Design a protein with these regions (language model features):
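Death-fold interaction domains
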Residues: 752-776
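Compact, charge-rich alpha-helical regulatory domains located at protein termini
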Residues: 681-759
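Secreted/periplasmic carbohydrate-active enzymes, especially glycoside hydrolases
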Residues: 1-331, 343, 348-351, 374, ...
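Substrate-binding/catalytic cleft of secreted carbohydrate-active enzymes
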Residues: 318-321, 328-560, 564-571, 575-589, ...
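Short phosphate-engaging motifs
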Residues: 94, 336, 707
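Long, contiguous interaction/targeting segments characteristic
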Residues: 86, 94-162, 497-569, 574, ...
């Protein structure tokens, strides 16, 4: 405990001691848990570390969260005589400049990787002050623009480290200075980087999961020391089925005869022995067995915490992802906490790890160098994790177009990954409109696309044909689905789900259709839902919710699993389960009384108020009981299969549809419910069968002269000539790739892109004109 300016600081200290009863402390790691913090121009105040200054304003909408400079002051422990001191930051977003007792130690650019500085020469016998100036303001550092909040601050652990003068380097790209390359046949190469180690010896022990030494070796310590070992018949790391891990304990000892000499430094890393490859027709193979990769993407933030989350938060996320039955995680869109990678090693998830080279390409040297730096740190710091299989070099980076500078940057990142780590594969997530034959689809080892057919554009049924066409045109390319999803807001409900209605029911329908699509396409090497959890995106304001992307299968606070969660569990897990959908869809009008059940059982029986209604066989892991009879008042509904019983929901019959379940026009959700008269006055749009409407695709509307005339008069004024020109269905997509993208969009989606320029009244007028025109 230390005291400064009337504030008490508690420090956590971890000591690494030598083995076999020797009591000499080799290195100490002290977790710094408190600081003084001030925004630019404001007074300092105590905060707990980890810390972000955007925990609340980064999630409340308005695209106005504070992006600027924050300063931290942290008192350091007194140095131990004869040792060297280092400071370690595991995450400081975006740029951090570090000072010790007023001496500048350096600046780190990149908000997601570990970095360290040597404090030794700046330290005093006591009263040492660390000052860290952090900024998340815009600069030539990635990410620049993206659909998530960039939380500022020291949001991960800060550690004070002491080591002997001779130690494994702490200054090699934020790593532990020990890199292990294990082969599935047991051949093991260890690259070690000791410093100040003349006259020292490096020893290495490989231990199995029970702690038994299965291989050992030693070598004279050199600046780059290489030791090669052979583990006989290694127990393979086999994903979720058997994530068996070994540990490598590397020690640095003074002298040549080290049997009786205590090590001066020891580093322990986790490894796994495995082999894998990806086939363009059959997908992912692990240790000679075909293992279809199906899983989720994950953002690291949480409600009211932002990125400053705890180990318990990481553990809960892992547990939820395991519960749904996933076997792969795309850790988007940046390097995640080392603790989460550790959890994945021991749980068995196959990981895609990536850098935040996202959305907007910056054609400057500083930005280019930052991609190289962030990729180097990502690969180096995560080299030993058996869970990682793929390095992601970018996400939707061609949104603003494909340029030669961007292409060169991407090819350089691919080459860098192969140089640093030839044992893994590279990938990238393409935005949907990238042509199937774009040169960008051939940069990385395997390819993935972010596709939202059925949400942003087109229909959910468009996904399968697109995958098939790509596979036909590129039979030797491995294709994956890096993102897909639909907004899923718990307060909106319908018995007639439709694209962009934001209801829980449409999201469930969408995800079920995607699962059916994937089930018949074994050539997809991976699929990753966007997203496992709702996350903050302060610029968002849609579906009656501000500041949030609601595509998660679990809510932002991790308290509620949405209905769509359970269709995945039904497909992906073997333990018998039953889930009755519609828990939040309580009021049911006469035509809204179907009950849907998700299950991995062959058959389920429905019970209403304890009475057996009947049994039905599951089809594609779902059962729909049509027009279930309800009594007045509350009705308790559940489903069973033998000893397996699902959840119980409560529904009640009402005479008419409850309009409180409908997302309002203009996304002003809160306003509708403040004034009941406004709800009653709403005019529902009509979409008569056999007639055109704003729900039709732009390409369809432009192909008909009458409907095209309606659009030209109405939309030309809003979008302008150039944007309207891109909508022309007669243009060749080779000349203008964006035209194909717009043609697949529903007119409602294009209106949405126009934002507030398209009012509810304008939508109504355009739709009224279109529904007068009969389809051929």
């Amino acid at each position: 405990m230390v005291r400064r300016r009337g504030v008490v600081y508690y420090l956590y200290k971890e000591s690494l001691r030598c083995t076999e009863g020797k009591e000499k402390i080799m290195r100490t790691v002290t977790l710094l848990t408190n600081a003084l913090f001030a925004k630019q121009g404001e007074a300092f105040a105590p905060v707990a570390l980890p810390h972000t200054w955007n925990a609340l304003d980064g999630q409340d909408g308005g695209n106005d969260y504070w992006r600027g400079v924050g300063t931290y002051q942290i008192e350091l422990p007194a140095p131990t005589k004869g040792k060297r001191q280092f400071i370690e930051f595991q995450g400081a977003n975006h740029v951090a400049t570090v000072y010790c007792n007023g001496r500048e130690l350096g600046t780190h650019k990149g908000g997601f990787s570990t970095f360290r500085y040597d404090l030794t020469e700046a330290m005093k016998p006591e009263d040492n002050l660390l000052t860290v100036v952090v900024t998340n303001a815009k600069s030539d550092i990635y990410p620049q623009n993206a659909d998530f909040t960039f939380y500022g601050g020291l949001y991960r652990d800060v550690n004070f480290i002491e080591v002997e003068p001779a130690h494994f380097t702490l200054l090699k790209d934020g790593t532990a200075g020990v890199f292990v390359t294990p082969r599935s046949n047991g051949k093991t190469r260890i690259d070690l980087f000791p410093v100040n180690a003349d006259g020292h010896t490096v020893t290495v022990d490989v231990k199995d999961a029970e702690g038994k030494v299965v291989a050992t070796g030693k070598a004279k310590a050199e600046a780059h020391t290489v030791i090669k070992l052979d583990v006989k018949n290694p127990h393979l790391w086999n994903g979720m089925a058997d994530p068996y891990c070994y540990t490598v304990e590397a020690s640095l000892c003074a002298g040549i005869d080290v049997l009786e000499v205590a090590p001066v430094d020891t580093v322990t890393v986790t490894i796994g022995y495995r082999s894998f490859h990806v086939d363009p027709n059959t997908g992912f193979w692990l240790n000679g067995k075909n293992v279809p990769l199906h899983g989720v993407s994950r953002h690291q933030d949480r409600q009211d915490k932002g990125w400053a989350i705890s180990k318990a938060d990481h553990e809960q996320d892992i547990a939820l992802i395991k519960e749904i039955g996933a076997n792969t995680i795309r850790l988007a869109h940046y390097q995640h906490d080392q603790y989460f990678y550790d959890l994945c090693d021991h749980t068995g998830f196959a990981l895609w790890a990536e850098i935040p080279f996202i959305s907007q390409f910056i054609p400057t040297k500083e930005a280019h160098d930052n991609t190289i730096s962030q990729m180097t740190e990502l690969v180096a710091q995560n080299y030993n994790h058996p869970a990682i299989f793929f390095w992601g070099i970018s996400n939707e980076i061609t949104i603003a177009g494909e340029t030669e500078g961007l292409y060169q940057n991407l090819t350089e990142l691919h080459a860098l990954c192969k140089k640093l780590d030839p044992s893994r594969l590279t990938t990238m997530a393409q935005v949907s409109m990238v042509p199937m034959n774009s040169e960008h689809t051939y940069i990385t080892d395997v390819q993935s696309y972010n596709h939202y057919f059925g949400w942003y554009v087109g229909d959910v049924e468009d996904n399968g044909p697109w995958f098939d066409k790509f596979h036909e045109l590129n039979p030797d390319r491995c294709l994956g689905v890096s993102e897909y999803g639909a907004e899923n807001i718990l307060k909106w409900h319908t018995a007639f789900p439709d694209n962009h209605d934001y209801t829980e029911e449409y999201a469930s329908h969408y995800h079920h259709e995607m699962l059916k699509t994937f089930a018949t396409r074994p050539y997809l090497w991976s699929t990753h839902v966007w997203n496992m959890f709702d996350f903050a995106a302060d610029a968002r304001d849609e579906g009656g919710v501000r500041g949030r992307n609601n595509k998660g299968l679990v809510t932002y606070d991790r308290k509620t699993k949405k209905d769509a969660f359970y269709i995945y569990q039904a497909y992906w897990t073997d333990k018998p389960m039953i889930h009755v959908c519609g828990e939040r869809f309580v009021d049911r009008a006469p035509d809204e009384r179907d009950i849907t059940v998700y299950t991995n059982c062959e058959e389920v029986t429905l019970y209403v108020n304890g009475e057996c209604i009947g049994a039905k066989k599951a089809e594609d892991h779902a059962v729909v009981f049509k027009n279930v009879a309800l009594k007045e008042g509350d009705n308790a509904i559940t489903a069973k299969h033998g000893e397996v019983e699902g959840n119980t929901i409560t529904v009640r019959p009402v005479a008419e549809h409850n309009f409180a379940y409908d997302v309002p026009e203009g996304n002003q959700g809160a306003n509708w419910f403040d004034d009941p008269a406004a709800v009653a006055a709403r005019k529902a749009m009509k979409f008569p069968a056999g007639y055109y409407s704003i729900k039709d695709k732009v390409g369809t509307l432009m192909a008909n002269s009458e409907t095209a005339a309606v659009l030209k008069d109405a939309m030309g004024k809003i979008l302008g000539g150039s944007a309207f020109g891109m909508m022309d269905a007669k243009k060749q997509t080779d000349d203008n790739p964006m035209s194909g993208f717009y043609n697949m969009m529903r007119l409602t989606d294009l209106m949405k892109m126009a934002g507030k320029n398209v009012t509810a009244e304008m939508k109504q007028q355009i739709n009224d004109a279109l529904i007068k025109i009969k389809k051929d």
